[in-house]
Structure formats: C-alpha cells, structure tokens
Amino acid sequence: MMRGGMGNMNNMMKQMQKMQKDMAKAQEELGEKTVEGTAGGGMITVIANGHKQILEVKIKEEVVDPEDIEMLQDLVLAATNDALKKADELSNSTMGKFTKGLNLPGGMF
C-alpha cells in the first residue's frame, strides 16, 4: 500500500514539473506575440507584446495638429490602453489553461 502511494506522489511531481516547464515556455512565447491597439480610426497605433511592453507607437501625420496637442495625447493614451487591454486578454487566455480550476484570486490569469 505504501508503495502505491509513493508511485502516485512521484507521478504527481512529474506532472507538476511538466506543467511548470510548459508555463515557462508559454510565458516566453507571450514575449514574442504582439497585439495592436488603435485609436482615432487607426490614426494612432500602439503595438505591445504579451508581457505588456510597448514596442512601437505609430502616429499618422494628418492627426498631428500643433494647435490641438491635447487631442493627440488623448488618442495616444486610448491606443495604449487598448493595446494593454489586448495584451492582458492574450496573457489570460494563454496562461489561463494552466490555472483552470485552481481558484486563484481574480486577475491572476
């Protein structure tokens, strides 16, 4: 009886190690995936990776109005928030498959 218990424990440890390895790989892949946030009908584009790092900001020339810098700032902010929201969604969908059923506090995948 003791022997079966140890076998189950070893099996569980192997499963945990595999899950840990798979999670590390998924985290690494998140850094390679990108999402795009936009505002102003595509006049502003912000590109972020799955680690929520902003990689690029594109501003179309016609949206730049020296008389209305505030509008440009608002559009950049909106596009950035859109990109970060999409990065969150990407992270949650990627990492969520590992934490399904673990009852982690909200916002943790």
From Swiss-Prot:
This is Nucleoid-associated protein BC_0025. SUPFAM superfamilies: YbaB-like (SSF82607). The keyword Transmembrane does not apply. Keywords: Cytoplasm, DNA-binding. It is found in: Cytoplasm, Nucleoid. InterPro entries: YbaB-like_sf (IPR036894), YbaB/EbfC (IPR004401). Pfam families: YbaB_DNA_bd. It comes from Bacillus cereus (strain ATCC 14579 / DSM 31 / CCUG 7414 / JCM 2152 / NBRC 15305 / NCIMB 9373 / NCTC 2599 / NRRL B-3711). GO terms for molecular function: DNA binding. Belongs to the YbaB/EbfC family. Homodimer. It comes from the Bacteria. Binds to DNA and alters its conformation. May be involved in regulation of gene expression, nucleoid organization and DNA protection.
